[in-house]
């Protein structure tokens, strides 16, 4: 049994995730996230926000899952969000044409045309996995779930294929909320839907999935991106080294300055993503960024890099994509709606300064000369302000600066988008946490993912021990811990169950606990134990 199969079996048995609708035979492309999976998913989301949202003061929204057809027609998805579908002439089974070819050892790219795939399938007599026939018809298949909004058949809608369009259509309101300033980052975490022809590879290709996306709106003439790291090295398999097949190790700063990356924000997000995925437990050597070439990238993108993680069984697998969407989306929605989706920037060209006297102070200070001072024109000299030849103190006047001339500039901001597949990240996190010790399964999840999870175990099922264990459980929960309570079975078997589930710490309540209040705390990875007071965990 390979590692991925073991991980998938463990994920189901320990409540992380499993195929949905199994009592009905299952439906490919749908997975249920279990109790432990939901907990880890939320912690991955929070970690992502700590890398991508909070440090820059970005905003977060939650838009509807259903979109009017008009929105997705304007965005280009209705015309372009399609995959090549091959239909068997004998049995009618349908598959992704490019997947059929690659499974037969015939490599194609995303730029390979429908006609070319049709020829390759038929000329190479690729067999139908269902009936063995070798005659195919290939056509485009729209990857969006269609629905009606309300009772009218002509009011068509789609389940969103990405959360991004829910951000773009709200740009005008969000810009006002952000007081007209760019750069402006808008994040959204939610579900996406893609009516995949033939979903496979467990959590990798789903029909309903979780996404974490961020749209960064910026001035293309002045990006104002954060400082880029000059020391860390990113493995970039970019266009210039694609033929060699080996990534170039280069800093985010160097990649931008050398023109490999078209945007400083794009470089910044790749840097953040590399560190974020490392924090999930994926080693540097098992990560890379690969550039999508012309004909491969999405219709809205001027440059795209995929962040890939290596699985022994599946090879390099995308977990995130970074698209330089420029002004494509905002211009498309502006054209369709007639709305002006722009940033208005006012720049002062010149100002005029005027000196206004505080007549009350002048009268109080200059009882003899105040009339001549007030009737004269203030004069600015190197050492101060004078009126009628008399130098005034600072409380006798104020200088008012007024805009004399300003320049108004309107521009459609450019967009850089980091987009993460949350389900894929969950799988990668568990995959790289999975290991064995003395023949036992251990899920060594990082502390940033399960650090605030602990098990409380009464050594034996005695009333006083159980009561004390519940008391400790309540104290820990009050302090923000997620607590698992388990009193069934031998203590060694309970430890093994917890190790396999990834629970980092286990507290055992025993006879000594009833005497002095101390408990045994056991570490999942080292199996070391020591006695502490439960309150020590709150420090």
Positions of the model-derived regions?
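NTP/phosphate- and nucleic-acid-binding module
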Residues: 1-539
